[in-house]
Design a protein with these regions (language model features):
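Short hydrophobic beta-strand element within catalytic cores of glycosyltransferases
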Residues: 299-303
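Short alpha-helical donor nucleotide-sugar binding micro-motif in glycosyltransferases
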Residues: 261-262, 269-274
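Nucleotide-activated donor-binding/catalytic signature segment of Leloir-type glycosyltransferases, i.e.
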Residues: 242-262
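A short, well-ordered alpha-helix in the C-terminal region of glycosyltransferases
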Residues: 329, 336, 343-357
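A short, histidine- and acid-enriched strand-loop-helix "catalytic/donor-clamping" loop
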Residues: 99-102, 116-136, 148-151
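Donor nucleotide-sugar binding/catalytic pocket of nucleotide-sugar-dependent glycosyltransferases
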Residues: 134, 142-187
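Aromatic "clamp/platform" in nucleotide-sugar-dependent glycosyltransferases that forms part
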Residues: 282
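Conserved donor-binding/catalytic core segment of Leloir-type glycosyltransferases
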Residues: 191-208, 212-217, 233
Length: 359
């Protein structure tokens, strides 16, 4: 079986999966841009990102020639190397990540002309409420494009529900869960600490909701014992950092520590130090950092708008789910775990049990 997997650019979460699949099937990746192989400015992180040289190790790949900018958007980069590198005779399956950009739309149509099977994987869900008009447009689009697609690869429950809501036959949907390298993040012996440590990782932007977490801590810090016994570690950079720091300083939230942006291999050291991972996102298609934290034996709290919550977070088993954009509810959930160390330890063990079967 020869598969051509088409992606915009090398991504740290995609490469381990591709390497794993390449052990048993012949997979060749076509990238439209090499932007992630050089240092570049990330607007959301508000920081220059240094390249990861291991993104291309362990599988066959090609970079398609393009003209103009190699910036990754819904339109760019522009390439015309459809037939030569994507639709050659030895390719049986075209696998696409995403369905709405013009490039993938054209490839889907051409693939059928060249009698290739088309697999599609997206990250979309119904957690973000769209207008009635937008939902109607999506249903019309899916009804047309579905004619040319052989199967949909679902990353989780919310993603599958999204396909079905747009009229896709469930028989065409196959589970290909969103995963990380559990072995890489597995921590046999957690670092012991007298403090109750909480971890947030991500871009410091409105969508990621770090401000919700900080407001929750501001409520909890009214209990001085909580303030003395806890440490909240914020890993990340972004446009909201200055405002967040101002709020922390104004309210004397001394137990909140900002440690800046860290590469994936360094984030692992923070998972080792902490007991509770919080993803307070206002919108999140999946949330792979939850996978990482669970593989590192952390209890989990995430918002109702995090895509992985139905699959990975079980209320009162390995953590809690709080109401989206509600810092008071988040504070209540944190306090439930903080005041019950035995429950916390059970949650940590149960997190690893769940994620071990999600690999």
């Amino acid at each position: 079986m020869n598969i051509k997997y088409i992606l915009t650019h090398p991504i740290q979460y995609q490469s381990p999966l591709i390497r794993f699949l390449n052990k048993n099937i012949n997979i060749n990746v076509a990238y439209r841009s090499n932007i992630s192989l050089r240092s570049y400015y990330d607007k959301d992180f508000d920081k220059k990102i240094i390249i990861n040289n291991k993104l291309l190790v362990g599988y066959k790949h090609v970079f398609l020639k393009h003209f103009g900018s190699n910036e990754v958007t819904n339109v760019k980069p522009i390439t015309t190397e459809f037939v030569k590198n994507i639709l050659s005779n030895n390719i049986e399956i075209i696998w696409l990540h995403g369905i709405y950009n013009w490039y993938n739309f054209v490839i889907i149509l051409l693939a059928k002309i060249y009698k290739k099977k088309v697999f599609v994987r997206t990250e979309t869900n119904n957690l973000k409420k769209n207008s009635l008009f937008k939902n109607i447009l999506k249903k019309i689009y899916y009804k047309f494009i579905d004619i040319f697609i052989d199967c949909y690869l679902s990353i989780g429950t919310e993603n599958k529900l999204n396909y079905v809501s747009h009229g896709i036959n469930p028989k065409k949907i196959f589970n290909v869960p969103y995963v990380v390298d559990n072995d890489f993040f597995f921590i046999k012996n957690k670092q012991k600490s007298k403090k109750f440590r909480i971890l947030f990782t991500g871009k410091l932007i409105h969508r990621k909701g770090c401000d919700i977490l900080i407001k929750a801590i501001n409520i909890l810090n009214k209990d001085l014992k909580f303030k003395r016994r806890t440490e909240i570690i914020i890993v990340g950079e972004g446009q909201m950092k200055v405002k967040l720091l101002e709020f922390v300083k104004k309210n004397n939230l001394d137990n909140i520590k900002f440690v800046g942006f860290k590469k994936q291999n360094l984030i692992k050291t923070y998972y080792k130090k902490t007991s509770l991972f919080i993803m307070p996102s206002r919108e999140e298609n999946w949330g792979l950092a939850v996978n990482e934290a669970m593989a590192s034996k952390n209890a989990i709290i995430c918002s109702t708008s995090v895509g992985c919550s139905k699959d990975l977070v079980k209320n009162n088993y390995n953590g809690y789910i709080f109401k989206n954009d509600n810092h008071k509810d988040l504070a209540r959930k944190i306090h439930k775990i903080y005041k019950n160390p035995k429950k916390l330890n059970k949650f940590k063990i149960n997190s690893y049990k769940i994620i071990s079967k999600w690999s």
